[in-house]
């Protein structure tokens, strides 16, 4: 019999985890296999100055699917493409970007994609599963029927 799915609820006002970094904070709640993040960035916050020293990557490697609650955020991709997001905007931001707060108002974002490992030192993140991917690439032997 299939397992019955049930509704779930959590609040970002009582997060599972809080990560604090220079001029910013991330509140996380996970349920149903999804990690929701509420990021708050203060005026003067810039990813390459506030988070890069923690994660030790050249660009933000997290993909984001975001709803922008307040403030203005400018994002530049590694190829030089730029876009600015403000209240009410939704956005998809691929890996390899930098971002910063525009103006004097804090930025608040709800992210449903890229916050699970955001602002987490590289050593604290799980290793990529190369062995598992290689195993999947091998052809499977056919089972013999008896």
Please give the residue ranges for each predicted region.
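A short, N-terminal "cap"/entry segment at the start of jelly-roll beta-barrel domains
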Residues: 1-40, 48, 124, 142-146
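Structural motif
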Residues: 35, 72-74, 96-98, 106
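Conserved short histidine dyad/triad with adjacent acidic residue
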Residues: 38-60
